[in-house]
Design a protein with these regions (language model features):
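Acidic/polar-rich alpha-helix caps and helix-coil junctions
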Residues: 1-74, 78-215
């Protein structure tokens, strides 16, 4: 396509976004079908340069203002906090040992020109895990979930990898808890957290706010 946007894979992006919103709509079989159409080796990114800079880096990472990483829990309650050694924590956060705040934003927001994924390929795997769990296909759900939990950074197009031992969750509730936990970690700062909290019925006490306070 002559006027293609640099960094954008149109077909995979359309199928990925279709899968996302079918899941949100409770259309689980259709969500699985759409997710299966996405090539997990391909990437789509919003690209930035010295003139058009990464907006999160410019407004938050570089200023430690607006919002900021607080600690290594990534906003999760203790029962769902990242497992020790989860490689995604080091991907999404960095540590400043000399100047407060100690925890800093990293990942896709660590420089003015860092590209931001339109979607992460692993989101498709988590969509399938959730959809299978919500339709009581627990074996398939656990298989998809463990693809994300055991994935190494080198096996991921964006170098996001937990590299942990597989989950042994055996009930729908336990698997869905693991799906929620891993969505929060794997897709950190992707803008999907509030929708996920609502869909998974998380307590409102876990939220800092329901809406960002724009006038």
């Amino acid at each position: 396509v002559a006027d293609a946007v640099p960094g954008m894979d149109y077909v995979n992006t359309l199928n990925a976004l279709k899968a996302r919103y079918l899941l949100f709509s409770g259309k689980y079989a259709e969500a699985i079908t759409a997710a299966n159409l996405v090539d997990l080796t391909k990437k789509s990114t919003f690209n930035y340069d010295a003139v058009s800079t990464n907006p999160v880096f410019t407004t938050a990472t570089a200023t430690n203002n607006v919002f900021q990483v607080i600690d290594s829990t990534l906003g999760l309650p203790a029962a769902l906090a990242p497992t020790a050694g989860d490689g995604r924590v080091a991907f999404y956060t960095s540590i400043n040992t000399t100047v407060a705040p100690r925890f800093r934003i990293n990942g896709f927001f660590n420089a003015t020109t860092t590209g931001v994924p339109v979607y992460l390929p692993s989101e498709m795997t988590l969509i399938k895990a959730e959809a299978y769990a919500r339709t009581n296909n627990l074996s398939a759900a656990l298989t998809e979930l463990n693809k994300v939990i055991t994935k190494t950074a080198s096996a991921d197009p964006f170098k996001v990898g937990a590299n942990l031992a597989a989950s042994t969750a055996s009930t729908a509730t336990a698997i869905l808890d693991e799906v929620y936990k891993n969505r929060c970690i794997e897709l950190y700062m992707s803008g999907l957290k509030l929708e996920d909290m609502r869909r998974f019925g998380r307590a409102t006490t876990e939220r800092k706010r329901n809406f960002f306070p724009y006038p």
